[in-house]
């Protein structure tokens, strides 16, 4: 078996698998490979346990500006449309209602203004008053005593929407389709990359077991590990990493759909939301919490997996200065300490209850169950030159046949949009063709019309 490929993708999560499919379906590349360190695809951030299983299209994510929502909506549409085109309903993609709610007069005023801006972007977006919310999500309004909660509440969303996705199953489907299209493609599992070497006009991707695969172009979609790999080759040395781990709590099956809350604009992390679990039936997830930790990947044991790569990246005065500036803000500092408490046995559950009751006011301590083994690390990029936290996705384009992607949320939602960008770059670099018009025709006709 030849180990030489046109392109090798490092990372078998949903982003890497989406690019594997996109190159196979729409480009003239002959052979593409994925190398993945786990024994199965999509076992880390793309696992159904690691994320909220949400297609983040911007309609109920209150931290998105209208400008960002317009872009994210188109990205989300591609992922949704792929699943519907392939007939993956109720296997990969699921239909539920979804809403964002404002609780209290200040948040309600914000939600009213937001609706006026966002109804032009999202066709069919409905505004919900307190009575309508009670009809759609009775447990959001009813208190423990069976009486409606006293706060003013308003929201908007959809009574029915393809809003939930199992990104691990989607990853598997991408790969199945790609292998059908190009039988010479290859997937290498249990291939943990140790280093990447440039050898003339080819890259050698070398595993810890001394296996080697070769490519004219390497795309690193390795989540938290992308930046250490980049820095090992001399790229991205002006960047650091703030790993933020999210955890969830389970509650009984008390929500019919997704319920999101208003996010503090100062905080780069999602506000607590409720999501019926698409994999574990009869459970609703409340979360995520946000805990910084010195690890690139979450493990059950706190001391297991502390990352030497991370220490190399972050043990410098610029990163400490960014951290100090962040912690100097009272709201951010309180948020960080509160989320540290959420992880503590016994007391954490008691403290988290108040946040969860914003969504389901009747919740009791007995209803909450810490979701062990759920949640994963999201790498937040630190710009050491600008001395600030960079929100969203980060890409290092070397223009030398290797690109590094760091894709925190909503990277899974945007996987096909990111795959489009990367596939075009790869095809252009290799002098191959890419069928952009057919891509849009299949997955985003709206953009083709515009």
UniProtKB/Swiss-Prot annotation:
Metabolic or biological pathway, per its Swiss-Prot or TrEMBL entry: Carbohydrate metabolism; tricarboxylic acid cycle; oxaloacetate from (S)-malate (quinone route): step 1/1
Reactions listed under catalytic activity: (S)-malate + a quinone = a quinol + oxaloacetate
SS bond list: none
Gene3D superfamilies membership: D-Amino Acid Oxidase, subunit A, domain 2, FAD/NAD(P)-binding domain
Gene Ontology molecular function, alphabetical: 2-hydroxyglutarate dehydrogenase activity; L-malate dehydrogenase (quinone) activity
Pfam families named in the record: Mqo
InterPro entries registered for this protein in UniProt: FAD/NAD-bd_sf, MQO
Cofactor(s) the protein needs: FAD
Keyword Oxidoreductase: yes
Highest taxon of source: Bacteria
Residue spans crossing the bilayer: none
Keywords of the record: FAD, Flavoprotein, Oxidoreductase, Tricarboxylic acid cycle
Gene Ontology cellular component annotations, sorted alphabetically: cytoplasm
Main enzyme class: oxidoreductase
Enzyme Commission identifier(s): 1.1.5.4
Signal peptide per UniProt: none
Ribonucleoprotein as UniProt keyword: no
GO biological process: tricarboxylic acid cycle
Similarity annotation: Belongs to the MQO family.
Alphabetized PANTHER family for the sequence: L-2-HYDROXYGLUTARATE DEHYDROGENASE, MITOCHONDRIAL (PTHR43104:SF2)
Protein name, as recorded: Probable malate:quinone oxidoreductase
